[in-house]
Swiss-Prot record:
Gene: sodB
Protein name as annotated: Superoxide dismutase [Mn/Fe]
Organism, scientific name: Rickettsia conorii (strain ATCC VR-613 / Malish 7)
Cofactor descriptive note: Binds 1 Mn(2+) or Fe(3+) ion per subunit.
Similarity comment: family membership: Belongs to the iron/manganese superoxide dismutase family.
Signal peptide: none
PROSITE patterns tied to this protein: SOD_MN (PS00088)
Transmembrane portions of the chain: none
Record carries keyword Nucleotidyltransferase: no
Length: 209
């Protein structure tokens, strides 16, 4: 795995990765029901779908998840790409958050944020605008590209690794990520994500790799 080795699974058949924390530890920001649906049902469905799509494709079965994403992107195989990318994106997202996370970071990541955005407050404002502004399902990302931090959004299963970009942080803005707890209030969810969930150590580890 180029960025988050926890997101990489070596080969077919793929399995649903465990969460890196107890589901209960995110109360009151996420309920158990959200994790049961988001991880246990949505994420798991992508895993099952990908395995079914690969069951008769022996050459693809030899590839790891990133290689499958690359192959399916280059060969315009939407079904395989969507499920493989969503497995990768979700696993990366689970590591992008942690209990009692969020707030203002320190160290190299804060230095880089101040350099590229002017201030942490400006970064927060821009990240929230991108996440809330993504029309329909998708993702908001902090990436390192062209020697600087950038905030981008991708629709549906879109992922930075399909375009040679280095992701540092992912925020899932599909409705299934927040609707149980926040209903249609995506801005509230993104605000909580920034203030109470971001795993800044994970972000910095990805930056310095």
């Amino acid at each position: 795995m180029t960025y988050c080795n926890k997101s990489n699974q070596t080969s077919y058949p793929f399995i649903l990765p465990d969460l890196p924390y107890e589901k209960e530890s995110f109360k009151p920001h996420f309920t158990l029901e959200t994790f049961d649906y988001h991880h246990g049902k949505h994420h798991n469905t992508y895993v099952q779908n990908l395995n079914n799509l690969l069951k008769d494709k022996e050459e693809l079965q030899k590839k790891d998840l990133e290689e499958i994403i690359e192959w399916s992107s280059q060969n315009s195989n939407a079904a395989i790409f969507n499920n493989a990318a969503q497995i990768w994106n979700h696993t990366f997202f689970w590591h992008s958050i942690k209990p009692q996370g969020g707030g203002k970071p320190s160290g190299k990541i804060l230095e880089q944020i101040n350099k590229d955005f002017g201030s942490f407050e400006e970064f927060c404002e821009q990240f929230k605008q991108e996440a809330v502004g993504q029309f329909g399902s998708g993702w908001a990302w902090l990436i390192y590209h062209d020697n600087r931090l950038q905030i981008i959004k991708t629709a549906n299963a879109g992922t930075p690794i399909a375009h040679g970009m280095k992701p540092l942080l992912a925020c899932d803005v599909w409705e299934h990520a927040y609707y149980i707890d926040y209903r249609n209030k995506r801005p509230d969810y993104v605000d909580i994500f920034i203030k109470h969930m971001i795993n800044w150590k994970f972000v910095e580890d990805n930056l310095i790799k």
